[in-house]
Amino acid sequence: MTATPTERWSDVLMGNYGVPPVTFVRGSGTELFDDAGNRYLDFLCGLAVTGLGHAHPRVAAALADQASTLLHVSNLFITEPQLEVAERLDRLIRSGTGSEANPAGGSGRILFQNSGAEANEAALKLARKFHGRGRHGVVAAFRSFHGRTMATLAATGQPEKHEPFQPIPEGFRHAAWNDLAAVEAALSPEVGAILLEPL
């Protein structure tokens, strides 16, 4: 007898969210299809990875074109697409949205990352580097989720997620969402950053 996808999954993959109940085989736009032919509306979007939908012809063509030209060389080297995206992001940031220009003016620096956790880790490191020793504290929101690395887990405002990994890094405090007074109460001279992900 042939093992089911669920059985095969259980044999080789770690169940950080338990055993997945569905095996998806393809997607189209906002829809997913499982191995039994059932159709689902994809509200999760691969945790925001597939926000443009599944199998979008222009996205698929751009990926295929880039993969057939140059797949990846790390950030130790320059590629033209990397420059084009960074320059475009820089222009958008400097111009602001609508009639509002960036009040900071000038150009920043773009740092590409592989995941949200890695981006948050970089933000935490940049805050520490900017402020130096003594201002390493971070205020984040209760019930937030910032990633699975140790620092982003500490920033995550869900104590039940901290427990299996104690001791977690220190210096993180949490305040209620939509409560400016609670955020202000959490501030102190050692706080160097506020980490909020509203989307």
PLM features per residue range, with description:
Residues L199:
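Active-site core of PLP-dependent enzymes with the aminotransferase class I/II
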Residues A3, V22, R26, G53-P57, ...:
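Electropositive phosphate-/nucleotide-binding environments in soluble metabolic enzymes
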Residues T30, L47-T50, A181:
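Glycine-centered loop/turn positions within well-structured domains
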Residues D35-A36:
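Residue-level recognition of short loop/turn positions
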Residues D90-L196:
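PLP-dependent aspartate aminotransferase-fold enzymes
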Residues M1-E31, R88, A176:
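Active-site-adjacent loop/helix segments that line or gate small-molecule/cofactor pockets in enzymes
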Residues D11, R39-R133:
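Glycine-rich loop-to-alpha-helix module at the N-terminal edge of alpha/beta enzyme cores
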Residues S28, F43-C45, A141:
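A secondary-structure boundary/capping signal
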